[in-house]
């Protein structure tokens, strides 16, 4: 009975491969096709609303964890990338500056940067933020900052 099934195995393998190539265009050998790396890190658009939400979350969390009496706010978003996982990981590099607002003040938008030479503080931080939209949850999974 095994000999009856043996000739059909190569046929089944060929059919499976053909269906896979037909259903997944990225698996084709077309040189112009975009290379897709599942789970790979890709650039994120800094102007995207989701990226802006993640930046605000990262800065708010940084301010909550930082021992400084004053709030910091973004000077510039240096880079942003994303990775599809169980949800999405965002990797952000943000330059932050100390403001004149203390942590008891809540409106960071209106806080000017502290320009007094002895009070200026600038840091560059790398943040990793995980977003699980089905749980309505963001969490900072890693970060490090350095003065410059």
Curated annotation (Swiss-Prot):
Cystatin kininogen-type domain location is 36-148
The lineage is: Eukaryota, Metazoa, Chordata, Craniata, Vertebrata
Q: Known InterPro entries for this protein?
A: Cystatin_dom, Cystatin_sf, Prot_inh_cystat_CS, Prot_inh_stefin
Answer yes or no on keyword Ribosomal protein: no
A Pfam family annotated for this chain is: Cystatin
Q: Where in the cell is it found?
A: Cytoplasm, Cytosol
Purpose: May play a role in the last steps of the chondrocyte differentiation pathway as an inducer of maturation. Induces chondrocyte calcification during endochondral ossification by playing a role in the transcriptional inhibition of ENPP1, a generator of pyrophosphate which inhibits calcification. Possibly impairs the binding of a transcription factor to the ENPP1 promoter. Unlike other cystatins, does not have thiol protease inhibitor activity.
Give the highest taxon in the source lineage.
Answer: Eukaryota
Query: In which tissues or organs does this protein occur?
Result: In cartilage, expressed mainly in mature chondrocytes including prehypertrophic and hypertrophic cells (at protein level). Expressed exclusively in cartilage.
Q: Which Gene3D superfamilies match?
A: 3.10.450.10
Organism source for this protein? Answer: Mus musculus (Mouse)
Q: Report the sequence similarity comment from the record.
A: Belongs to the cystatin family.
The entry's keywords: Biomineralization, Cytoplasm, Disulfide bond, Signal
Give the phenotype of cells or organisms lacking this gene: No visible phenotype. Microscopic decrease in the calcification of hypertrophic chondrocytes at the growth plate.
The signal peptide, as residue positions, is 1-33
GO process annotations (BP): bone mineralization; bone morphogenesis; calcium ion homeostasis; cell maturation; cellular homeostasis; chondrocyte differentiation; endochondral ossification; gene expression
GO MF, one example: cysteine-type endopeptidase inhibitor activity
Q: What is this protein called?
A: Cystatin-D
According to the UniProt record, which cysteines are disulfide-bonded?
A: 101-111, 125-145
The UniProt induction remark is: By high phosphate diet.
- Has the keyword Signal been applied to this entry? yes
One GO cellular component term of this record is: cytosol
């Amino acid at each position: 009975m095994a000999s009856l099934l043996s000739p059909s195995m190569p046929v089944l393998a060929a059919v499976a491969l053909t269906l896979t190539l037909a259903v997944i265009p990225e698996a084709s050998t077309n040189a112009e096709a975009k290379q897709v790396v599942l789970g790979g890190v890709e650039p994120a658009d800094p102007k995207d609303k989701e990226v802006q939400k993640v930046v605000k979350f990262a800065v708010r969390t940084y301010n909550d964890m930082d021992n400084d009496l004053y709030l910091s706010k973004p000077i510039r978003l240096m880079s942003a990338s994303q990775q599809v996982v169980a949800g999405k990981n965002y990797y952000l590099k943000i330059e932050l500056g100390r403001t004149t607002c203390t942590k008891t003040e809540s409106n960071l938008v209106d806080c000017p940067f502290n320009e007094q030479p002895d009070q200026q503080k600038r840091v560059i931080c790398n943040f990793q933020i995980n977003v699980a939209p089905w749980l309505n949850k963001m969490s900072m999974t890693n970060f490090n900052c350095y003065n410059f």
